[in-house]
Amino acid sequence: MVDNNKTVDNNYKHTSVLLDEAVNGLNIRDNGIYIDGTFGRGGHSRLILSQLGPEGRLIAIDRDPQAIEAAKSITDPRFSIVHGPFSDLAHYVRELNLVGRINGVLLDLGVSSPQLDDPERGFSFMRDGPLDMRMDPTRGISAAEWLMKASADDIAWVLKTFGEERFAKRLAKAIVERNLTQPMTRTKELADLIANASPFREKHKHPATRSFQAIRIYINSELEEIERALDGALEVLAPEGRLSVISFHSLEDRIVKNFIRHHSRGPQVPAGLPLTEAQLRSMGGRTLKSVGKMMPPDAEVAENPRARSSVLRFAERIKE
């Protein structure tokens, strides 16, 4: 999610990645019911509302208290917002008795620009602030707390699995040794330690890039959240309802791609296995069809470099 805004007041300035493309892919119906699973600062929500008719409805979700505060500027009666993780979207829809009636779900994955740009959130190695990294600072433990209690093996696993960090063991050892003598509580402390412990620097990439991504993903259970959100979207979508998902790195995109691919196939039956038509029907069929994939145009990347790695994928719910 890259939704650039400088403040959390009424003076919003949006640079949502693939804004028009992501919303257009939902095929907005005048009287449709839509979910923006990642409100951020409302770039996608506002565009969806502008395309809905008087009977349309938009339900937004975000676990960041600052996003919930930002949503107060939208007074449109067709709009409502839920404070919570998007992984629980099916639960929210069940409570509203709208399962099977949702015409589109939009998910803009990852960390947002306001989160990255606010030093107090602790997401960025470029700005010194508390070593937090929680998308909802009221829940769970901070990055600093986790790094203090985690073993070198656990830290190395996180750096390797979620950051694809080639020097994971070396960096994990340095983190644990530092915390034994002088616990780290600031982002700059962690970024400097990683930079000093890294034996190799990639061109045009800070040595702490992969590690900060990995720790953030782990602290927020981001990949598990995505998997649950996709399952939830499939549960609540109406026939011909659309799923529109923007991802920002290969781990996210792999989950989305594999989910769409898996649900776009019918039951996998070994050749020659004797099954009746009734048995085949009982195994279920395809529930999604892939509608397409898009990358940001060069002009958008030039204007907003954070869009460079984004991938937008669409799928449509099939009638059962």
From Swiss-Prot:
Keyword entries, A-Z: Cytoplasm, Methyltransferase, rRNA processing, S-adenosyl-L-methionine, Transferase
Catalysis: reaction(s): cytidine(1402) in 16S rRNA + S-adenosyl-L-methionine = N(4)-methylcytidine(1402) in 16S rRNA + S-adenosyl-L-homocysteine + H(+)
Positions contributing to S-adenosyl-L-methionine binding: G42, G43, H44, D62, F86, D108, Q115
Entry superkingdom: Bacteria
Pfam families, A to Z: Methyltransf_5
This enzyme's EC code(s): 2.1.1.199
Similarity annotation: Belongs to the methyltransferase superfamily. RsmH family.
Protein name, UniProt field: Ribosomal RNA small subunit methyltransferase H
Lineage: Bacteria, Pseudomonadati, Pseudomonadota, Gammaproteobacteria, Enterobacterales
